[in-house]
Amino acid sequence: MAAVADSVENNGSINLPENENLIPAGFSAAALLDENSGAFPELNQPDSLAAAETTFPDTNDSAEERWPGWPGDCVFRMIVPVTKVGAIIGRKGDFIKKMCEETRARIKVLDGPVNTPDRIVLISGKEEPEAYMSPAMDAVLRVFRRVSGLPDNDDDDVQNAGSVFSSVRLLVASTQAINLIGKQGSLIKSIVENSGASVRILSEEETPFYAAQDERIVDLQGEALKILKALEAIVGHLRRFLVDHTVVPLFEKQYLARVSQTRQEEPLAESKSSLHTISSNLMEPDFSLLARREPLFLERDSRVDSRVQPSGVSIYSQDPVLSARHSPGLARVSSAFVTQVSQTMQIPFSYAEDIIGVEGANIAYIRRRSGATITIKESPHPDQITVEIKGTTSQVQTAEQLIQEFIINHKEPVSVSGGYARIDSGYVPAYPPQLSNRQEPLPSTYMGTEPVQYRPTAYSQLGGPSTYTPTLTGQTYGSEYRPASDVGGYSSYNL
């Protein structure tokens, strides 16, 4: 005991086994802590948090590491029907003012061309990296709730209103659309699978005339709640595309410049079209009079073009010398706006096969013959379909006439031995001639609900591969048609 006491007095500790260093040789305390760091969850930050810290510096950093206006603004452009603008603004602007105050974002409905049924809602707000949902994202979802009729709060009425078919579109840059698709379509596919809504990027031919050449449309369709989930995922992905606060006004200025350009070109184009109509009816001796009048309009055209000012700096590129006169996007806008018309027809579902045809032969023929863009959509009524026709006035009229001809030639089902009869060239049905009682053209607002049985008709030399897949559960009339490769410029349409 005396030896033990002497050791304690001289060394200050007792040389017991539990006081020996148990860390193996070659290992430091720091290395051992790193190996056992799994026991401390707070020490294992995920890669996403590390990336977030790299992308968005800490708020305690000095101001010298940031730039003026850091981190930037989020900008979203929603395309809504003009009939829904009142639901966004409210009486005396109460709704839009309340949304701006609650979300701390800027919401503005831009003026559009007179003949277009759409309006662009410009939504912008300063990005908040620490927030789960930025002010601009919150404003986008609130605007969609107002447009689709969803209540602001998640209550019992949400399930009833959320099952209604709805749609919404976003106007984005081409680079954002490509990024949204992802590698081999993986990103947009995951959004569709997780939300259950239909999400697609419209082609350049389907892009509206008021969009620039480097812009695309993101189209969402489906039930309102599913669209809301998909819209949240899309804007959550696009929130990384930030712009400086000084760039936000350019979105509105360039859009209004394109609109004003089309308004200036409209009366001039109408004058030219009337002149060409007169020239087609003139006789040979009057050709000299036409030759004297034509240069007047050409001179007027040059004077109008000379007054057009440059459009300024491009939002998505570094080229500051794009001009309104030589911009291919503006040239396409002015030429398309002059006679752009949109017409909607409500057709009984019993005539769907007559309009579409076997393997889409009839609808492909109508598109080729008229040159119009024809989209078949679902109707709020289960026994009807909506046919939307877009194009010039003559194209829309031709398409309507062809559709009415197919409806008039609708045949009642009869029993034919041996299946289909011999098919002659042209567009003669394969059934025995039996005229239908419906011999009057169907108006665009036809709301008839008379159930009519029908059988598929076949037309020669118009076949093409097609696929019919249901798009909405619980609806026996939902299908998707993909036209043949020989019909270019037209994407799928939903029934």
From Swiss-Prot:
Gene3D superfamilies: 3.30.310.210, K Homology domain, type 1. The keyword Hydrolase does not apply. Residues 73-140, 165-234, 340-403 form the KH domain. Keywords: Nucleus, Repeat, RNA-binding, Transcription, Transcription regulation. One of its GO terms (biological process) is negative regulation of short-day photoperiodism, flowering. Detected in roots, shoots, leaves, flowers and fruits. One of its GO terms (cellular component) is nucleus. Disruption phenotype: Subtle morphological alterations in pep-2 and pep-4 such as leaf alterations, phyllotactic errors and sporadic presence of small fruits with multiple valves. Occasional asymmetry in valve growth and unfused carpels. Rescues the flk mutant late-flowering phenotype with a concomitant decrease in FLC RNA levels. PROSITE patterns: KH_TYPE_1. It is found in: Nucleus. Pfam families: KH_1 (PF00013). InterPro entries: KH_dom, KH_dom_type_1, KH_dom_type_1_sf. One of its GO terms (molecular function) is RNA binding. CDD domains: KH-I_PEPPER_like_rpt3, KH-I_PEPPER_rpt1_like, KH-I_PEPPER_rpt2_like. Residues 474-495 are annotated as: Disordered. Interacts with HUA1 and HEN4. This is RNA-binding KH domain-containing protein PEPPER. It comes from Arabidopsis thaliana (Mouse-ear cress).
